[in-house]
A protein has these predicted regions:
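Conserved C-terminal alpha-helix-loop-beta "cap" of PLP-dependent enzymes
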Residues: 51, 88-167
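Conserved PLP-enzyme active-site core in the AAT-like
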Residues: 1-99, 112, 122, 129
Length: 167
């Protein structure tokens, strides 16, 4: 089952973070999960200072309950099939309209290729970020830049690091 695959997959990890607003199917929250008791103990100090006690992390009971249901539902075949098909449909429509997108499509998002979409914007003017902002201003489309800004500057030279992909 999908749940068994997910459980085994995460059994091999040391830890993970999750924004529950996306794949947890809730309106707020997130979590950190760790397989190392020593790191967990260190992390709890910061959790208490900034988020709330370790048993609820600043979330109320309703939101924690909704997150539990959302995580369960997000591993159901019908939900995943529908979501993946919706993403694929959107991607195919964009390709049909000539929009440069990264392929193959996944199940989480469609990534526009800013290097091909807006090649006239110089890289040092953050073309992927500019594209994301304009899509929001013009169409209300909420996205995020995965490119030069996310790559951050070189810690020693303080110069931009330009990744191959600007999405």
């Amino acid at each position: 089952s999908i749940k068994e695959i997910v459980k085994e997959f995460f059994s091999y990890t040391d830890g993970m973070t999750m924004s529950a607003k996306k794949d947890g199917l809730v309106n707020m929250g997130g979590f950190i999960a760790l397989n190392n008791a020593e790191i967990y103990k260190k992390a709890t100090v910061y959790n208490i200072m900034f988020e709330g006690f370790i048993t609820y992390g600043g979330l109320n009971g309703r939101d924690m309950g909704a997150l539990a249901v959302g995580l369960d539902e997000a591993t159901e075949f019908d939900y995943l099939e529908t979501r993946i098909n919706q993403v694929a449909y959107l991607g195919a429509q964009l390709v049909e309209f000539g929009v440069p997108v990264q392929q193959p499509f996944g199940g989480h998002a469609i990534f526009l290729d800013a290097n091909k979409f807006v090649p006239t914007i110089p890289r040092n003017e953050y073309r992927a970020q500019a594209l994301a902002i304009e899509l929001y201003i013009i169409g209300g489309i909420r996205g995020v830049e995965i490119g030069t800004i996310l790559a951050d500057r070189d810690p020693f030279t303080h110069k931009n690091r330009y990744p191959e992909l600007e999405l």
